[in-house]
Amino acid sequence: MEIIAGTTDFYLEKDTAVAIGKFDGVHLGHRRLLEEILGRKKYGLAACVFTFDPTPAVLFGLSDGKELTTREEKRRLFERLGIDTLIEFPLTKETAATEPERFATEILAKQMNTRFVAAGEDLSFGKNGAGNAELLERMAPHLGFCVQTIEKIEVNGIEVSSTYIRKLVEEGRMEEAEEMLGMPYTCLLYTSPS
């Protein structure tokens, strides 16, 4: 798997199928998006995950940065699932101020050669989070790609989300968390010499 991190200056030569998101926990909802882009490999598209580093919530001080999975764990999961390219786009106040239309035109269409986007129904991107799946659907025909919006997944009548899974983990409700993750939950413990 190719990893592009720490730079906004990149170009993907191969046509791509892209999933955009934070992918914290790589839970069942995320996997649904990933299944869509992986399914496009049979049409010659490279499966590409686009994520922000740090997340917008961390950049703007709305989150403490606690995540279900570390960067290294996410990378291993993506590689195991068959993702071809992972882009960890550097999010700064400047890049976060990119208008959504410019993001779609310059980054998705030109830099990434996007031909297909799997978008969660709660996708937001660009300045003030103003970009969404609906905007991508409107712009897609003019930019040479198509968009499939994926509905939220529920487990036992509850919407799967990283926020809810973090709550389950904090409460020690591991079986429920693992059901939404679709895999066992692991945590890394670091020790220091005493």
Per-segment meaning from a language model:
Residues Y190-S194:
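Conserved small/polar residues in nucleotide/adenosyl-binding loops
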Residues A97-L189:
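Classical nucleotidyltransferase
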Residues D15, D84, R115:
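Conserved acidic residues
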Residues T7-R71:
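N-terminal catalytic cores of NTP/NDP-binding nucleotidyl/phosphoryl-transfer enzymes
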Residues R40-K41, F78, A140:
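A generic structural signal for well-ordered alpha-helical segments
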Residues Y43-L45, I83, F145, M183:
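Short glycine/serine/threonine/alanine-rich loop segments
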Residues A47-Q111:
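Active-site-proximal cofactor/substrate-binding loop regions of enzyme domains
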